[in-house]
Curated annotation (Swiss-Prot):
Active site: H63, D105
Tissue: Expressed by the venom gland.
EC assignment: 3.1.1.4
Source organism: Craspedocephalus puniceus (Flat-nosed pitviper)
Main localization category: secreted
Top enzyme category: hydrolase
UniProt KW Metal-binding keyword: yes
Cofactor requirement: Ca(2+)
Compartments where located: Secreted
Gene Ontology MF terms: calcium ion binding; calcium-dependent phospholipase A2 activity; phospholipid binding; toxin activity
Name used for this protein in its record: Acidic phospholipase A2 Tpu-E6a
Binding positions (Ca(2+)): Y43, G45, G47, D64
GO cellular component, one term: extracellular region
Length: 138
């Protein structure tokens, strides 16, 4: 029970419907999104500034940009419909906004999978000074 409470606290204040996104990341990469990507580089986790540190961090940068383009619903609170088929995620439902959020999460999960080899522990919990340079545009 204590583990569930800690997980719930960790999920507070982080972007997106984390449970669905977490499941997508786990399905596509075999890794826990919370454990591996919640505080990585300049963009993985809450907020994002500066230059992406590597291809994995760029996945988070692109995900942030994707969320920034969504209009008509809140990516931070939305629950969408999706299914997993073999090694892919299929976004469903009739709501275009929710489907767009799902596609943002799907693309990030695939990006994490495709860039597993770029993950470098030196970018875990980087000092905030590392991410102070001006961000590139989406």
């Amino acid at each position: 029970m204590r583990t569930l409470w800690i997980m719930a606290v960790l999920l507070l204040g982080v972007k997106g419907n984390l449970l669905q996104f977490e499941l997508m990341i786990k399905k596509m990469s075999g890794r826990s999104g919370i454990r591996w990507y919640s505080d990585y580089g300049c963009y993985c986790g809450k907020g994002g500034h500066g230059q992406p540190q590597d291809a994995t961090d760029r996945c988070c940068f692109v995900h942030d940009c994707c969320y920034g383009k969504v209009s008509g619903c809140d990516p931070k609170m939305a629950f969408y419909k999706y299914s997993s088929d073999n090694n892919d995620i299929v976004c469903g439902g009739n709501n275009p906004c929710l489907k767009e959020i799902c596609e943002c999460d799907r693309a990030a999960a695939i990006c994490f999978r495709d860039n597993l080899s770029t993950y470098d522990n030196k970018y875990w919990n980087v000092p905030s000074e590392t991410c102070q340079v001006e961000s590139e545009p989406c």
